[in-house]
Design a protein with these regions (language model features):
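C-lobe/activation-segment region of protein kinase-like
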Residues: 189, 199-294
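Juxta-kinase regulatory segment immediately upstream of eukaryotic protein kinase catalytic domains
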Residues: 2-48
């Protein structure tokens, strides 16, 4: 769980070079020849994720990256161990071809559950070709929507935040779970539906369904707590508990338990020199303490 990583190696709503279709220096295959495009472009692509044109269709090619080091998970791993909360324990991203296989499998599973995720068009060892969530039109992540809404005031921010809550609840209502349910990985599509991206790891390989769903809620809160706490923490509680009312008893009990275990984290230092992850953990703990105080 590392929401600090917001670089251009994601599948949708990107800024910079990865947002524009990568130029092809050869004639594109006929529309529908996804496997051929993947075979041709995978060895040429330097970016981890880049978009391409296949006829009139925009597609995304994701190639295997290096195995991710454990250091990036150190803050939450230490906290999870100290609190004895498995739901907070990071699920390491294996990187490489293994992560590609996991992502392809999870995209298919979630798609079959009726959720809006990129369609797997073709795959081979070390590479994956996916559809564009916007079908060629612009998409906006919940992260971007929150940042825009924050400037408009608390009411706008809460509305944007609730969209993310509802999107996660829709996944859970189908008996499913996400992976890294951070605001950057929830994507507003042009038709108004929120889609989901980034499935290089699978918490379900180590945890039960209830724990995976609790991770989704805490991941989203972790990535948004600083904005929410600064704007309207009490009003946000009403949205939070309204959505949680439809969660299973097991999920609600585990969230309340996590809130109690995390209480002391509200006293973590607030200075920026301690890092953004520490600030987010502190903000999350303060919100949960306020929302679940007895």
């Amino acid at each position: 769980m590392n929401p600090a990583r917001r670089g251009p190696t994601r599948v949708a709503a990107r800024k910079g070079a990865a947002s524009a279709p990568a130029p092809l220096d050869e004639q594109a295959p006929q529309a529908g020849h996804y496997a051929e495009l993947l075979r041709r472009m995978l060895p040429k692509q330097s970016q981890t994720v880049a978009s391409h044109r296949l006829g009139n269709e925009r597609v995304w090619l994701k190639k295997a990256g290096p195995r991710h080091g454990q250091w990036r998970y150190r803050v939450l791993a230490l906290i999870a161990g100290a609190l004895r909360l498995d739901v907070l324990r990071p699920v390491p991203n294996p990187g490489g071809s293994e992560a590609i296989l996991i992502e392809a499998r999870r995209l298919r599973e979630l798609g079959e559950a009726g959720l809006r995720v990129p369609v797997v068009l073709a795959e081979q060892p070390g590479g994956l070709l996916m559809s564009d969530l916007g079908q060629g039109r612009a998409t906006v992540s919940v992260l971007e929507r929150l940042e825009q809404a924050a400037a408009a005031g608390p009411a706008s921010l809460l509305a944007a935040w609730r969209d993310g809550l509802d999107a996660i609840a829709a996944v859970h209502a189908r008996g499913a779970y996400l992976s890294q349910a951070f605001d950057r990985n929830l994507v507003h599509c042009p038709d108004g539906v929120i889609g989901y991206i980034d499935f290089e790891d699978d918490p379900g390989m180590a945890l039960g369904l209830a724990e995976c769903q609790v991770r989704d809620w805490l991941s989203y809160l972790h990535s948004t707590a600083m904005l929410v706490r600064a704007a309207a923490p009490q009003a946000a509680a009403e949205h939070w508990h309204a959505v949680q009312a439809d969660a299973s008893d097991a999920v609600r009990e585990r969230i309340a338990h996590a809130a109690q275990r995390m209480r002391w984290l509200r006293h973590l230092p607030s200075g920026r020199r301690w890092g953004r992850d520490t600030q987010r953990v502190r903000a999350s703990a303060r919100l949960l303490n306020r929302w679940y105080s007895r």
